A protein has these predicted regions:
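Bacterial Sec-dependent N-terminal signal peptides
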Residues: 1-31, 39, 222-227
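Short glycine/proline- and aromatic-enriched beta-strand/turn motifs that initiate or cap beta-hairpins
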Residues: 25-68, 227
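Short loop/turn motifs that connect adjacent beta-strands in outer-membrane beta-barrel proteins
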Residues: 26-33, 72-79, 122-128, 182-187
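Predominantly the C-terminal beta-signal and adjacent terminal strand-loop region
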Residues: 31, 90, 170-227
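Residues that define the transmembrane beta-barrel architecture of outer-membrane proteins
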Residues: 32-34, 57-61, 107-113, 127, ...
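Transmembrane beta-strands of outer-membrane beta-barrel proteins
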Residues: 34-40, 77-83, 111-113, 129-137, ...
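Transmembrane beta-strands of outer-membrane beta-barrel pores
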Residues: 42-46, 87-91, 112, 121, ...
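Flexible, solvent-exposed loop segments that connect beta-strands
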Residues: 47-54, 89-109, 141-169, 201-220
Length: 227
């Protein structure tokens, strides 16, 4: 659809802008620093379906390894890049107000790699405010499905409830902001992000049931890094 093409074009432009900022900071002060560590947090998930599927938020977990490289300080802005290797749970939980007795939960497990521009403002030792933005790719590894007995009295939709993931490669854009406390004992980060998938996990041709099946995830996480 034209709307999706426009959204994808805007997303690509934002990614290019986010990565261009550090690359144009060559006239800044050299501040090379490499840090590694780990992260963990929660996902608040939903899935964008077309046709629409009534649902409520589904909570999952995320966590993994983080590496960050700081390259420049451009005026008051610290510029760098961050990459992560995470386990992350996505999916959806159906809720129909007309039939509240029905329960269907699908949890989908991924290995994800966010590639982020890191832009920060603040003190070398103290508190910094930072912004992250960039592309994210993911690989589907497994899922679980929970369907209660109330469905025995209703006809379910096989294309919605019984179909396996068809596109195991997931990609999209992610971004967010947070605070970092830099100490001699290490760096502690608290962050909120949003992930918007540009890919569908079901096939979406004209003959398929869904024309859209994409993840949307609010992420809250804590990260610890040491130099």
């Amino acid at each position: 659809p034209k709307t999706m093409k426009i959204k994808n074009s805007i997303g690509a432009a934002l990614l290019l802008a986010a990565w261009a900022l550090p690359s144009h900071a060559q006239i800044g002060e050299q501040r090379q620093n490499f840090a590694v560590g780990f992260n963990g947090g929660i996902n608040i998930n939903s899935v964008s379906f077309s046709p629409t599927v009534r649902q409520k938020s589904l909570m999952g977990i995320n966590g993994g390894l983080t590496a960050r490289y700081i390259s420049e300080k451009y005026f008051s802005m610290i510029c760098g890049a961050q990459v992560e290797l995470n386990f992350s749970q996505h999916g959806w939980s159906e809720f129909d107000e007309d039939h509240p007795e029905l329960e269907y939960i699908r949890k989908m497990n991924y290995v994800e790699i966010p590639l982020l521009a890191h832009l920060a403002f603040g003190r070398d030792r103290g508190v910094q405010f930072f912004v992250h933005a960039g592309p994210q790719i993911g690989f589907f590894i497994s899922d679980t499905r929970k369907k209660n007995d109330a469905w025995n009295n209703y006809t379910s939709t096989p294309e919605q409830h019984d179909k396996n993931v068809e596109n195991k490669f997931d990609y999209g854009i992610t971004g967010g902001a947070g605070l970092e406390l830099r100490t001699k004992a290490g760096n502690f980060l608290v962050e909120g992000r949003y992930y918007y998938a540009l890919s569908d996990f079901y096939k979406s041709t004209k003959k398929d049931y869904f024309s859209r099946s994409a993840h949307g995830t609010i992420v809250a996480k804590i990260t610890y890094l040491f130099d």
